[in-house]
From Swiss-Prot:
It catalyses: (2R,3S)-3-isopropylmalate = (2S)-2-isopropylmalate. [4Fe-4S] cluster binds at C347, C407, C410. Binds 1 [4Fe-4S] cluster per subunit. It comes from Trichormus variabilis (strain ATCC 29413 / PCC 7937). InterPro entries: 3-IsopropMal_deHydase_lsu, Acnase/IPM_dHydase_lsu_aba_1/3, Acoase/IPM_deHydtase_lsu_aba, Aconitase_4Fe-4S_BS, Aconitase_4Fe-4S_dom, IPM_dehydratase_rel_enz, IPMI_cat. Keywords: 4Fe-4S, Amino-acid biosynthesis, Branched-chain amino acid biosynthesis, Iron, Iron-sulfur, Leucine biosynthesis, Lyase, Metal-binding. Its EC number is 4.2.1.33. Pathway: Amino-acid biosynthesis; L-leucine biosynthesis; L-leucine from 3-methyl-2-oxobutanoate: step 2/4. Its cofactor is [4Fe-4S] cluster. This is 3-isopropylmalate dehydratase large subunit. Heterodimer of LeuC and LeuD. The lineage of its organism: Bacteria, Bacillati, Cyanobacteriota, Cyanophyceae, Nostocales. The keyword Metal-binding applies. NCBIfam families: leuC, PRK05478.1, PRK12466.1. Belongs to the aconitase/IPM isomerase family. LeuC type 1 subfamily.
Length: 467
């Protein structure tokens, strides 16, 4: 395993064989399931008379469609109720662990798996959700998959995949005050483009990542897919082990010491060979805001929306489309853009540390008149921990709504949606047209602290002015 990257080692250890097509048949150590992409997969198994091969390696929760205001059953939305009932039935029939609403462990799938200790270094992880790359923060190789692949994993615990190249992205130095993990990943995507990572796994490295806690690393890995990479990961270290130790599904006792020794062995070697290496300086990264309709259309909060001629030729068409859709123009400051709705939450930024940073901004201040602002914890555990610290009271005193866990306005498969031409400041991961529920709604991505700042000021503003 000399000169190997973590990706190479984990891939090779989980390779079942090479198929006639040339694809690798890869064993999946953990399969995460939710209510949106699984019903058809379970139905396909039934049609073929198949059972779930390894139910003990499958864990389910409900997150995408759950309302965050009133979670009483049956849901008002009939389709949402049907979807959760289908998941309940499928899990019961197949002996799959299911964390339902009220279990104490329900939440966004990419939040609950790490906090339960299910996500561990060296694993291969799959889920029918684009942002499965989040789990790479632990040194796992994690893929988002489609419904037919969900079926394949349920039936065979394997996926047929092409091996990726590995790009090392180093970020070195200490982030300036008011600059967060969300700014790091938005800056990377802005620089490399939304297609820059196609065909790659991204290894995030450097002193900046060494200084990050696990929740910050999850934020970065969560959005690897937005930069075109199939997955992103950080090598495990003592920060990883400290986070995992004592969690529900983490190894215990003598097994813990064995696990750590093995986790150390699968880290990228010092002389590992990469297909590409790109280096960033943390000091160059500003609080970042997206202005357009892709996560790559980002600028520093004090910068101007770019002129077409400042962009690469292949980016100009999408930029022109973004100017029209967003009703923004080249050379306009993003700072001062009026905001209608502020959303703090999602699998990108719905964890405890995200809420803590936003609460620092909200404390002793109040949401601007005419702005709707709400906070959605990423899980029942996050909600409980935040309430134990009094964060809910801080937010409510500042005029924010405090909600129940769920995906919420990240994708608007639930009642949390923009209306008409509303523009939101959002801590989520996608700003596509119509992403937040209105066909003409507009989304500006930023860190939770920046969202809180926008809520207080009623417009895009620099969080550093409130620190």
């Amino acid at each position: 395993m000399s000169k190997g990257t973590l990706f190479d080692k984990v891939w090779d250890l989980h390779t079942v064989g090479t198929l006639p097509s040339g694809l690798t048949q890869l064993f999946i150590g953990l399969h995460l399931v939710h209510e949106v992409t699984s019903p058809q997969a379970f139905a396909m198994l039934r049609e073929r008379g198949l059972k779930v091969l390894f139910p003990e390696r499958t864990v389910a929760t409900v997150d995408h469609i759950v309302p965050t205001e009133n979670q009483a059953r049956p849901f008002v939305d009939r389709l949402a109720e049907e979807m959760i009932q289908a998941l309940e039935q499928n899990c019961q029939e197949n002996n799959i662990t299911f964390y339902n609403i009220g279990s104490g462990n329900q939440g966004i799938v990419h939040v609950i798996a790490p906090e339960l200790g299910l996500t561990q270094p060296g694993m291969t992880i799959a889920c029918g959700d684009s942002h499965t790359s989040s789990h790479g923060a632990f040194g796992a190789i994690a893929f988002g998959i489609g419904t037919s692949q969900v079926r394949d994993v349920l039936a065979s615990q394997t996926l047929s995949l092409s091996k990726l190249k590995v790009r090392k992205i180093e970020v070195n130095g200490t982030l300036n005050p008011g600059v967060y993990a969300k700014d790091v990943i938005l800056h990377i995507i802005r620089t490399l483009g939304v297609k820059g990572g196609v065909g790659y796994a991204y290894e995030y490295a450097g002193t900046t990542f060494e200084q990050m806690n696990m929740e910050e690393r999850m934020t970065v890995c969560n959005m690897a897919i937005e930069g075109g990479a199939r997955c992103g990961y950080v090598n495990p270290d003592q920060v990883t082990y400290d986070y995992l130790q004592g969690r529900d599904f983490a190894p215990q006792g003598a097994d813990w010491e064995k696990a750590v020794a093995w986790w150390e062995s699968i880290k990228s070697d010092a002389d590992a060979e990469y297909d590409d290496v790109i280096v960033f300086n943390a000091a160059d990264i500003p609080p970042t805001v997206t202005w357009g309709i892709t996560p790559g259309q980002g600028i520093g909060v004090n910068q101007l929306i770019p002129q077409p001629e400042e962009l690469l030729e292949e980016d100009r068409f999408v930029a022109e489309e973004a100017y029209r859709y967003m009703d923004l123009y080249p050379g306009q400051p993003i700072k001062g853009t009026k905001i209608d709705v502020c959303f703090i939450g999602s699998c990108t930024n719905g964890r405890l540390s995200d809420l803590q940073e936003a609460a620092k901004i909200a404390k002793g201040r109040h949401v601007a008149e005419g702005v709707k602002a709400f906070v959605v914890p990423g899980s029942e555990r996050v909600k409980k921990a935040a309430e134990a610290e009094g964060l809910d009271k801080i937010f409510e005193a500042a005029g924010f709504e405090w909600r129940e866990p769920g995906c919420s306005m990240c994708l608007a498969m639930n009642p949390d949606k923009l209306e008409g031409r509303q523009i939101s400041a959002s801590s989520s991961n996608r700003n596509f047209k119509g992403r937040q529920g209105s066909a003409s709604g507009r989304t500006l991505l930023m860190s939770p602290a920046m969202v809180a700042t926008a809520a207080i000021q009623g417009e895009v503003a620099d969080v550093r002015e409130l620190l």
